[in-house]
Design a protein with these regions (language model features):
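Conserved beta-alpha-beta core of the PfkB/ribokinase-like small-molecule kinase fold
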Residues: 125, 131-208, 225-226
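Conserved N-terminal subdomain of the carbohydrate kinase-like
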Residues: 46-130, 301-306
Length: 306
């Protein structure tokens, strides 16, 4: 199978607190780039994943998930000496909160020497996130090497900022994300992330800064406000689609997967953003990062009715 979109990062097993019983957690799956792949696959893109898992039951569950979701896991390695990552989602009046058990995980031990260079060169697009780079020094080196290799072979690259300061200090995050921006064709930042990374507090100034690194297309995720799409020629706010949200876990990943899937399918950036806004909104109407991600038919039904 020819892969449209390859993503590199860490997949994890999720335990999401139930709203009706705080003592109970529902098991699911997460990891931002894995969520991205599944969202893109549910919109019809052919996706593949680059990572490593522990030789454990959780790792096998993730492989089973990708098989069911038609995400190619050929390039997900087994690490006999490490575990697969786990995280917990809790909910309160201030929203959702994350706690991670990922130190020393299989994905964090990934190195540049393990990259599937031919698969990257053969893909249409390579996707990473700030978390892909933050989980360890070796994983960061591998991610940047993957982006450079993709660029060398004419493969487009996309980057979701996904800043997690629990994983790395701000100065290192800024240094390495600047390197990533310089290798990035399409950036999917959120306000909180990119305002911290750039030190800027104006939307257009942030877009100017990203474009100065060479980023050609920016889809600025603004939550309930929608998405601010910027090309070299045009900048436009694409309004959000409003729903009664239950859990926003993974909504940004869903947006990214849907947006990139539609770009690869040939949509212009503004049409792709309209589609992705609906897709991400629908993903917040259930609990967990993966289970509520809608299929293309559900999104298209809403778009056709507007």
């Amino acid at each position: 199978m020819t892969i449209d979109i390859l993503a590199y990062g860490e997949a994890m097993v999720e335990f999401n607190q139930r709203a009706d019983d705080a003592r109970m957690y529902l098991q699911g799956f997460g990891g931002d780039t894995s969520n991205f792949c599944i969202a893109a696959a549910r919109q019809g893109a052919r996706t593949g994943y680059i990572s490593a898992l522990g030789n454990d039951h959780f790792g096998q569950q993730l492989r089973n998930l990708w098989q069911a979701e038609q995400v190619d896991a050929t390039h997900v390695l087994h690490d006999q000496q490490a575990a697969s990552g786990v995280y917990f989602v809790s909910h309160d009046k201030d929203g959702h909160h994350f706690d991670y058990l990922r130190a020393g995980s299989a994905a964090s031990r990934y190195t540049s020497a393990q990259l599937p260079l031919q698969a990257i060169a053969d893909a249409k697009l390579l996707h990473l996130s700030g978390i892909s780079l933050a989980i360890s020094a070796s994983a960061c080196d591998a991610g940047l090497a993957a982006m450079a290799h993709a660029r060398k072979h004419g493969v487009r690259t996309s980057l979701d900022t996904n800043l997690r300061l629990k994983l790395w200090p701000l100065e290192r995050a800024r240094e390495k994300m600047r390197e990533a921006f310089a290798l990035c064709d399409i950036c999917l930042p959120s306000w909180d992330d990119v305002s911290i990374l750039t030190g800027l507090d104006d939307r257009d100034a942030i877009v100017d800064a990203l474009q100065a690194y060479g980023v050609g297309l920016i889809a600025f995720k603004l939550g309930a406000e929608g998405c601010y799409v910027a090309t070299r020629e045009e900048r436009r706010l694409v309004p959000a689609y409003t729903v009664d949200a239950l859990d926003a876990t993974g909504a940004g990943d869903c947006f990214g997967g849907a947006f990139i899937a539609r770009l690869v399918a040939g949509d212009d950036p503004f049409a792709a953003a309209r589609y992705a806004n609906v897709c991400a909104a629908l993903s917040t109407t259930g609990y967990g990062a993966v289970a509520p991600i809608p299929l293309a038919a559900q999104v298209e039904k809403i778009l056709d009715s507007k």
